[in-house]
Amino acid sequence: MNKLKVSALNLVPIREGQDDSDALNDMIDLAQHLEQVGYERYWIAEHHNAPNLVSSATALLVQHTLEHTKTIKVGSGGIMLPNHAPLIVAEQFGTMATLFPNRVDLGLGRAPGTDMMTASALRRDQHNGVYQFPDEVDQLQQYFGPANQQSYVRAYPAVNKQVPLYILGSSTDSAHVAARRGLPYVFAGHFAPQQMKEAIQIYKELFEPSEVLSEPYVIIGLNVIVADTDEEAEYLASSMAQVMVSITRGKMQPVQPPTDKLDQVLSLIHI
């Protein structure tokens, strides 16, 4: 049996009593710790107009993390492609791959990573980005490909860098995109587990071998609490419970400390 590879996704949250600078320092501290204990990769999300998250400039955070680590793979989990021109994404990640060879991952999502009003501000007059996602993935593959596959517009220094692409998703739509291109598939089971089994099944059934992969490759995002005892794990998980409840009630509060009085605390989170 192959050894299970474990990685981490960081939304770069702000904890209660901290500011954005503290959150960025924590991001680096966590990356360095996970590198020491043998994690495979460390990905950073993309979120906009979120006062409790500092992950709006994902490419900059990926580069900053690469600069402060030595061996762990670092990437986006992911770049929300409808918000960005594929050419610029290729130039940015091609540059990082030049500076840090064989350490850069590029996870790609098709959601805006924010509310619709903010998405409109990001995209300006480009409102069909979600529907263009498959074509834009193809563009990125071309930009990272060999010189003889390029068109007039080239994403230097991305040409022939072959930065690994990962298709992210929380529904079955993304499974089709990944399968038809023979790309790795990453399912967001940490917030959308309902369609996880179906999406992975579709991906495996429709998978077409490519120069990248000869067989399907799946990564699953899960919420995991690690502790020495079940009691301690439940205590630590109370922070996540407070986050989830605040989100469902339209709040964007910093991550709260653990509590052994969870029911009482949750009752104070008003709509």
Region annotations inferred by a language model:
Residues V62-K70, A97-R103, A179, S210-L213:
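Acidic (Asp/Glu)-rich catalytic clusters
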Residues H48-S56, P82-L87, A192-K197, V226:
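Acidic-and-aromatic substrate-binding clefts and catalytic sites of carbohydrate-active enzymes
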Residues N2, S120, Q126-R154, Q195-I269:
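An alpha-helical appendage that flanks or caps ligand/catalytic pockets
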Residues N2-D20, P82-G145, Y185, P193:
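Flexible, glycine-rich active-site loops centered on histidine and acidic residues
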Residues V6-A8, Y42-I44, V74-S76, V104-L108, ...:
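Hydrophobic faces of well-ordered beta-strands that scaffold small-molecule active sites
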Residues A179-F187, F191:
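A conserved active-site cap/scaffold subdomain adjacent to cofactor or substrate pockets
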Residues M1-T69, H270:
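N-terminal beta1-alpha1-beta2 module of alpha/beta enzyme domains
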Residues A23-M27, T58, V89, F133, ...:
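Aromatic/hydrophobic pocket-lining residues that form the small-molecule binding cavity
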